[in-house]
Amino acid sequence: MKSWSSRPVPELPGTGTAPRVHDTSTGQLEPLAARDGRASLYVCGITPYDATHMGHAATYVAFDLLHRLWRDAGWSVDYVQNVTDVDDPLLERADATGVDWRELAESQTELFRTDMSALNVLAPQHYVGATEVVDRIVPAVERLLERGLAYRAPAGTGQGGEPAPAGDVYFDVDAAGALRAEDPDAWVVGSTCRLAGERDRMMPLFADHGGDPDRTGKRDPMDPLLWRAHRAGEPSWDGASLGPGRPGWHIECSVIALDLLPRPFTVQGGGSDLAFPHHDMGAGHAYALSGQPMAEHYVHTAMVGLDGEKMSKSRGNLVLVSTLRAQGMDPAVIRLAILANHYRTDWFWTDELLEQARRRLGTWREAAAKQETAGADAMLEAVRAALGEDLNSPAALIAVDAWAARNLGGAAARGSGASSQDTRLARDTVEALLGVVL
């Protein structure tokens, strides 16, 4: 699957330092280390039926900051993002709108690409649809069956009481967790998000985020689906010994990551709603297949709301990037509105936030339009320091604000040492590290 085009990133003087980020698996700020000068990133992509809402945009802009920081530190970056281009919500939306699910997925994926390019998000090297890797998922599920870490469920009833045919394949979380007796680093359910042993907390999350605890015939209600046997009216693929069907959600990302990234890769990223079960179960699948942890660190972005409520597809209160762009909004303003909020803090989208970002961008561009400015060296170091400490974008914006104010305050405020080179450095800093073109 094609990705999108990226603007060249300006090179900055000096070298940035390795950032520290909050790791969900430890609950602490952790330094990120390169391996032979390379860092690797997997960010879970969209299910393409309501792209690109502000929650999506906030997540991908946050990990774009990390991508840019790694490059500024002189590291090469291996970046993979998937597209869940077949899944129950997509099929339900296609059925409700009378659009073929493949057409819906492709149109929404193309819209997402356009939005990401407009927001100046650096493209992943690998952009992979789940439907493109079914032929690799099937043997992975077969291996889990052979190792006794998965099982076929008998015919029964599904999550909504609908008939469930024999042949659904589930991951056995208890059998996989037992591997810890041999390896203290082995996965157990909940271990990547500090929920291990807290079943009362995990079960509601499992049910609310794609799980099917009420499916009869499962060994444990929290066992996740690996292969969904074919149902009438649903797309299916040749599953070899599994029979016709389609893959479960978590195994898609596990297989893509194992195929394209080191083991373990540096950062697994996504929204906080993916921490459990999606990222945790995906880590379980990856360990069961490879005998190694999936990722070194798990990093999650907070939720975005509107008018005091969580922004979500189910609530129908989405603010779409494409809608704002169609209304004539500069994508750089949208990006600045996102960056005004720390990636780990829940926040609400408002018209005032957008207006503040519009005014801020205008001020920055006015300063950057001056032939000669001063203070860009200090601004560069302040932006690097702010982003290096858990991607503190609000602090980074304040550093640019200070530079702009100094250079719009007249010669006395600007002081000595003004030059055209300073203006170029300021523009390059804001674009290279914050992704905002002045």
From Swiss-Prot:
It holds the Pfam family tRNA-synt_1e. Keywords: ATP-binding, Ligase, Metal-binding, Nucleotide-binding, Zinc. Its cofactor is Zn(2+). GO terms for cellular component: cytosol. Zn(2+) binds at C44, C253, H278. SUPFAM superfamilies: Nucleotidylyl transferase. L-cysteinyl-5'-AMP binds at C44, G45, I46, T47, T59, N82, V83, T84, W249, G271, S272, D273, V304. A motif ('KMSKS' region) lies at residues 310-314. Monomer. Belongs to the class-I aminoacyl-tRNA synthetase family. MshC subfamily. This is L-cysteine:1D-myo-inositol 2-amino-2-deoxy-alpha-D-glucopyranoside ligase. The gene is mshC.
